[in-house]
UniProtKB/Swiss-Prot annotation:
Disulfide bonds: none annotated. This is Succinate--CoA ligase [ADP-forming] subunit beta. GO terms for molecular function: ATP binding; magnesium ion binding; succinate-CoA ligase (ADP-forming) activity; succinate-CoA ligase (GDP-forming) activity. Keywords: ATP-binding, Ligase, Magnesium, Metal-binding, Nucleotide-binding, Tricarboxylic acid cycle. GO terms for cellular component: cytosol; succinate-CoA ligase complex. Binds 1 Mg(2+) ion per subunit. Belongs to the succinate/malate CoA ligase beta subunit family. It catalyses: succinate + ATP + CoA = succinyl-CoA + ADP + phosphate; GTP + succinate + CoA = succinyl-CoA + GDP + phosphate. Its EC number is 6.2.1.5. ATP binds at residues 46, 53-55, 99, 102, 107. It is an enzyme of class 6 (ligase). The lineage of its organism: Bacteria, Pseudomonadati, Pseudomonadota, Betaproteobacteria, Burkholderiales. Residues 9-244 form the ATP-grasp domain.
Amino acid sequence: MKIHEYQGKELLRQFNVPVPNGIPAFSVDEAVKAAEKLGGPVWVVKAQIHAGGRGKGGGVKLARSMDEVKKYASEILGMQLKTHQTGPEGQKVNRLLIEDGADIKKEYYFSIVTDRGTQKNVIMASSEGGMDIEEVAESHPEKIIKVFVDPMVGLTDADCDIVAKGIGVPEASIPMARDVFKNLYKTYWDTDASLVEINPLILEGNGKIKALDAKFNFDPNALFRHPEIVAYRDIDEEDAAEIEASKFDLAYISLDGNIGCLVNGAGLAMATMDTIKLFGGEPANFLDVGGGATAEKVTEAFKIMLKNKSVEAILVNIFGGIMRCDVIADGVVTACKAVNLTVPLVVRMKGTNEELGKKILADSGLPIISADSMAEAATKVVAAVAKNK
């Protein structure tokens, strides 16, 4: 789960991480009142969406007068902000953060993420913070330092000093940097975050360290013990299809292709998408119906897939272990009739009650294309899309 920058900064304040004074605003009038309350003389008007790259996309503006605050708030609120993380359609800006300007002497990058490979938390930091960190990571990976933190030990002073010296924090500011790093790690640990990213973390002219941005991801499996974080959830920032799928215990992620996928098991779902790509197609979604699929769940899965107007064909790929093929077949037939399916449908089934499942599909009278292997299924669904062009 993601939250907005201003919400992340509320969390950081609770953990004694220095951040600029700021006030969220949901209208132009609120933005002006927020600026008046902060006092100025310089303010930053920041779009609040669940995506990075806002500055490059025109979603962050420096205002030096109330007129400019009003002007930029009017321009940004309601805009469809496009960044490298939003996709070509962008995201609508429904809220702003009005913040005091900062005396920036140096920008750093700092983040904490979970590293499953080492089963540790890893701090990644760089002396090259700011809007171009992605380019830095790609072209100069040596400028990104990593410090692995054993969760049984926690972040030590030695770890903090390695990070601070590695990114070039001045000697006089290292004690404060050490405190900030420790408090950031405590924020990450105590909130069950899977990512805390501060970009930029700044050195001010007075030598103080401050978090100028705040990006959080939280482990959804731990949200049950963090109602205060769940309260930050902004449904408007989430994919409507993914929200609908979660109501039926379906694991669904929207993609940019035109071939809908309905599969049981996350591993098989990913392999199915890879195979579609291998044979020249583009998957429109990841969809795992799990091991307890019913006719209702399959029907809802079809409805969710077909709400995406880009879907030109559907591939159902089922391995009958816990899930019986005849149950899925019944669900597919019911779903096709319920949604009045008009796009080509390819079904591949293997496993428990496979023959019975195939018979149910064959006897349905529906124009279902059958396949015996994953390669054959992918070939047929790609061909079906091409035929309908």
